[in-house]
Amino acid sequence: MCNPSTTTTTTGSENQESRTGLFLDLFSINSFEPTKRNLRHCENRGSPLMAEAVTEAKSLFTLAFPIAVTALVLYLRSAVSMFFLGQLGDLELAAGSLAIAFANITGYSVLSGLALGMEPLCSQAFGAHRFKLLSLTLHRTVVFLLVCCVPISVLWFNVGKISVYLHQDPDIAKLAQTYLIFSLPDLLTNTLLHPIRIYLRAQGIIHPVTLASLSGAVFHLPANLFLVSYLRLGLTGVAVASSITNIFVVAFLVCYVWASGLHAPTWTDPTRDCFRGWAPLLRLAGPSCVSVCLEWWWYEIMIVLCGLLVNPRSTVAAMGVLIQTTSFLYVFPSSLSFAVSTRVGNELGANRPKTAKLTATVAIVFAAVTGIIAAAFAYSVRNAWGRIFTGDKEILQLTAAALPILGLCEIGNCPQTVGCGVVRGTARPSTAANVNLGAFYLVGMPVAVGLGFWAGIGFNGLWVGLLAAQISCAGLMMYVVGTTDWESEAKKAQTLTCAETVENDIIKAVVASTIDGECDEAEPLIRITVLY
């Protein structure tokens, strides 16, 4: 923790002392004093726990609702792209689906996971009133993601050869590569979009992102109509439309935030500091990426396993319908997860562990209720939901049989997703990664393969495997959250944000030369920030 004391020391002869001074300027935490006074005020006023919980619930809802709207808009945009691919023909739909799956596995999931490494840094720094750290972390993350785009781009340029090597149809593989090449601008815009969203969300600023997403959705449909239907660019037009839409979203978001001055309290111009001092970010980004990818990739593996079952055409199609369904239901717990991660990070950064614990508790209760509602929804629409996507009787039968299992999965998925958000807010992404690895691949995968193939249950056996994974993940995550030492996490938050500041100050420490001019007596020759 940063030492609150300040010490000034002089050295050298009297002649030297008259010209220069050597200052050991220890970092002060005076900026925390208002927070401490507020905390004492809250503790002394004796407000009931229920009233505090209601207040916290309102704060979470205020954050989560616009995030959910944004996610639903993105879901709608994806559906529009799939619609235009389907209108082009079976070959284009298959190639586009393969390209999107490859892009998700090798690109979008990776960038999304790596960007989440900045979330605890930004939310805790904002709570600790270390505003400069927010923009510095934003700059570093953008540079980091741009660097990561280089190997991803190489993969995308060679997806045709990779797909043929994996025994995919050569025509489908060639078209998939075309789609991905024209999606590269979209990949690059994500290196800006993800960090900006997190930078704003850490400050509780959500509405600009929602407005930008809504504007993008309005822009996306005419862009597809113009490029695909009018110019007849085919599959290439769908990819270009997605790229142009995201460029429009980023431009709208940046212009809106800049014009409204929302960036002003925490903004600093980019400097060479964004090219160094990456250690704290990398320590959080790596495990965050692993955690996201382990869960994201599971669903892609499920599609591959469906292709090995009897009548793969129907099982793969039914799995696609159900994954679209669970993606829709996932919008709500994931939005709550982002909200609770921000709130927990803010409170720990402000050194309010009791409030952080209350936030986590309220969010998990919300998640449990959300899971029950999702399960009831899945069960009630089991015989009708599939008709939105297809009229094939066999696909409809598979979908109707698996939807109740999907609903049970949501009872576990909602709490574990929100629990993962709590863990992210405490800057422990490696814990979430370990939980996902154990639950999905050491429990869920063996159960899915065993029931789906060895026991002969087939399609439903794969979904029972997912149910086992979600139950295990929820149980482990609740244990992690329940055993969290909140006082210790608050201290770690102070250390994390202070250590980042100290690292930058040490890097920038210089010895001032006084040969060419007089040095003001109040200006130190060396300024050193010390972390105890």
UniProtKB/Swiss-Prot annotation:
One of its GO terms (biological process) is xenobiotic detoxification by transmembrane export across the plasma membrane. Disruption phenotype: Enhanced resistance to bacterial pathogen PstDC3000 in RNAi mutant. It holds the Pfam family MatE. Expressed in the meristematic regions. Mainly detected in tissues where cells were actively dividing, such as leaf primordia and young leaves, the junction between lateral root and the primary root, root cap, hydathodes, the junction between secondary inflorescence and the main inflorescence, young stamen and young siliques. Highly expressed at the junction between the hypocotyl and the root, and at the marginal areas of cotyledons and true leaves, coinciding with the locations of the hydathode. Also highly expressed at the basal regions of the newly emerged lateral roots. It comes from Arabidopsis thaliana. Overexpression of DTX51 alters shoot developmental programs leading to a loss of apical dominance phenotype. GO terms for molecular function: antiporter activity; xenobiotic transmembrane transporter activity. Belongs to the multi antimicrobial extrusion (MATE) (TC 2.A.66.1) family. Functions as a multidrug and toxin extrusion transporter that negatively regulates plant disease resistance. Plays an important role in maintaining normal plant architecture, possibly by regulating local auxin biosynthesis. May act as a negative regulator of hypocotyl cell elongation in the light. This is Protein DETOXIFICATION 51. It is a multi-pass membrane protein. The keyword Amino-acid biosynthesis does not apply. It is found in: Endosome membrane; Late endosome membrane. PANTHER family: MULTIDRUG RESISTANCE PROTEIN. The keyword Membrane applies. Its main location: membrane.
